[in-house]
């Protein structure tokens, strides 16, 4: 068995490489680094080469910046222009890390690919090989893998699933390994300083400018600075003085209007999602289901209704057991069981 370890230059992937090299030996493990940018500052490759030399494992570097631009960056920009709030990490996992990079690993002779995601892949009696939340709830990345096809995860290895971040750092220190990029990666890797507004403004896509900001009953309360700068459920940065805290209820893209409401007024009990990716066959789902529509959100109880439509992709309606803040179209809805196994994922729509 040969294992390719996807390495970025950070703590998690370096530990993954070191621990698998120890488990399988240097003749069955190699490192694989993908370049996602044409021009790179603080290039980790020289330091990665040194660490791979110390571990006596080969390092392969592949240039995927053109593919990354077409598959991730351009759709990210277009989604904002269309009034959505995309999650590029979800698509990167599905199309790049467990898509293009996995294919490259196979071409180089790997049977399996390992990453530093904080998740576990467990043989379940009913589900088969199933994805489960990481033990470190502050780092758990199961949400971001809910759109990755089941078959692409079957040959994955996730050594960090049972560990906490502090343990990973301590173990690396004991191994005497120095992290090439000691600083934690930013929220969106291709957006400088996590300033997505500045990034979008520098793009070549037309973005809606300022427009009316109204309450749910139509009362005009001000002007917004462009719908793409706001997301459903947002509270901070609205620039409106009101007797109660206001939140974004929804964005009316057709007339460039931002609709606000108080917390109790904007709560919803349903949302819809499409392009459903099944990580566990629906027939094997338990009765108790839980849904997350945001990364940092705790999964909440919900019922799932499958909607029959004429399109080839499946669509679902999510019925929350208790009212929730509105979910942003373009974000991911991930479905879990009560033990933290990921059952499916889909993209949230603005259908009612």
Swiss-Prot record:
ATP binds at residues 6-13, 116. Its main location: cytoplasm. Disulfide bonds join 92-189. It catalyses: S-sulfanyl-L-cysteinyl-[protein] + uridine(34) in tRNA + AH2 + ATP = 2-thiouridine(34) in tRNA + L-cysteinyl-[protein] + A + AMP + diphosphate + H(+). One of its GO terms (molecular function) is tRNA-uridine 2-sulfurtransferase activity. The record marks 117, 331 as: Interaction with tRNA. Residues 139-141, 294-295 are annotated as: Interaction with tRNA. CDD domains: MnmA_TRMU-like. The active site is at residues 92, 189. Keywords: ATP-binding, Cytoplasm, Disulfide bond, Nucleotide-binding, RNA-binding, Transferase, tRNA processing, tRNA-binding. PANTHER family: MITOCHONDRIAL TRNA-SPECIFIC 2-THIOURIDYLASE 1 (PTHR11933:SF5), TRNA 5-METHYLAMINOMETHYL-2-THIOURIDYLATE -METHYLTRANSFERASE (PTHR11933). Catalyzes the 2-thiolation of uridine at the wobble position (U34) of tRNA, leading to the formation of s(2)U34. This is tRNA-specific 2-thiouridylase MnmA.
């Amino acid at each position: 068995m040969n294992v390719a370890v996807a390495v970025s230059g950070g703590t998690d992937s370096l530990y993954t490489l070191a621990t698998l090299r120890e488990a399988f030996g240097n003749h069955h493990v190699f490192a694989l680094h993908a370049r996602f940018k044409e021009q790179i500052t603080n290039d980790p490759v020289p330091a990665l080469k040194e660490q791979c030399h110390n571990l006596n494992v080969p390092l392969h570097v592949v240039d995927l910046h053109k593919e990354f631009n077409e598959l991730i960056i351009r759709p990210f920009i277009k989604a904002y222009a269309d009034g959505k709030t995309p999650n590029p990490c979800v698509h990167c996992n599905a199309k790049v890390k467990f898509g293009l990079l996995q294919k490259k690993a196979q071409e180089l002779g790997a049977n399996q690919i390992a990453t530093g995601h904080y998740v576990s892949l467990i043989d379940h009696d009913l589900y088969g090989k199933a994805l489960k939340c990481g033990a470190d709830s502050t780092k758990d990345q199961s949400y971001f893998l809910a759109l990755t096809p089941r078959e692409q995860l079957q040959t994955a290895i996730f050594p960090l699933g049972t560990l906490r971040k502090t343990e990973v750092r301590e173990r690396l220190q004991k191994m005497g390994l120095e992290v090439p990029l000691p600083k934690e990666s930013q929220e969106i890797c291709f957006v400088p300083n996590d300033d997505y507004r500045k990034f979008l403004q520098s793009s070549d896509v037309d973005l809606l400018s300022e427009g009316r900001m109204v309450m749910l009953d139509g009362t005009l309360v001000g002007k917004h600075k462009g719908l793409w700068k706001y997301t459903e459920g947002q509270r901070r940065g609205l620039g409106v003085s009101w007797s109660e805290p206001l939140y974004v209820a929804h964005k009316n893209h057709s007339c460039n209007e931002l609709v606000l409401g108080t917390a109790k007024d904007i709560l919803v009990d349903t949302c819809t999602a499409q392009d459903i990716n099944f990580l566990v066959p629906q027939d094997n789902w338990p009765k108790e289901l839980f849904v997350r529509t945001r990364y940092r959100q705790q999964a909440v109880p919900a019922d799932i209704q499958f909607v029959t439509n004429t399109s080839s992709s499946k669509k679902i309606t999510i019925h929350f057991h208790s009212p929730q803040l509105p979910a942003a179209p373009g974000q991911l809805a991930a479905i879990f069981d009560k033990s933290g196994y990921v059952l499916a994922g889909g993209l949230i729509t603005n259908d009612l």
